[in-house]
C-alpha cells in the first residue's frame, strides 16, 4: 500500500484512467462485434449502417489515449475491408 499522499493520489488517478480506457475500448469492440455478427448473418445493410459508429468509437478511443492512433486506423481499415468484401461477394 502506498504511504505518501502523492502515491495515493497516483493510485486513484490510475484507477480512473483504467476504467475510462476500459469503457472506450469496450464500446469500440462491441461496435465491431455487432458488424461482424451482421456480416455472419449476411446482413450487409445493417453492417454498413454500423460502420460510421464503429469508426467514430475507434478514433475517439485513440483520441482519449485508450489505444494508439495506428491501432484505431488498423481496426477501422479491417472492418471496412470485411464489409466491402462481403458486399462484393454478394453482388457477384
Curated annotation (Swiss-Prot):
Pfam families: Ribosomal_S20p
A single GO cellular-component term on record: small ribosomal subunit
One GO molecular-function entry: small ribosomal subunit rRNA binding
InterPro entries per record: Ribosomal_bS20 (IPR002583), Ribosomal_bS20_sf (IPR036510)
Keywords: Ribonucleoprotein, Ribosomal protein, RNA-binding, rRNA-binding
GO term, biological process aspect, one: translation
Origin: domain of life: Bacteria
Family: Belongs to the bacterial ribosomal protein bS20 family.
Primary role: Binds directly to 16S ribosomal RNA.
Protein name: Small ribosomal subunit protein bS20
Gene name per UniProt: rpsT
Amino acid at each position: 500500500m502506498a504511504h505518501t499522499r502523492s502515491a495515493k493520489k497516483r493510485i486513484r488517478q490510475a484507477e480512473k484512467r483504467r476504467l475510462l480506457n476500459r469503457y472506450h475500448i469496450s464500446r469500440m469492440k462491441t461496435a465491431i462485434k455487432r458488424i461482424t455478427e451482421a456480416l455472419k448473418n449476411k446482413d450487409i445493410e445493417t453492417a454498413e449502417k454500423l460502420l460510421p459508429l464503429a469508426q467514430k468509437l475507434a478514433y475517439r478511443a485513440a483520441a482519449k489515449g485508450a489505444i494508439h492512433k495506428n491501432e484505431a486506423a488498423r481496426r477501422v481499415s479491417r472492418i471496412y475491408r470485411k464489409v466491402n468484401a462481403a458486399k462484393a461477394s454478394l453482388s457477384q
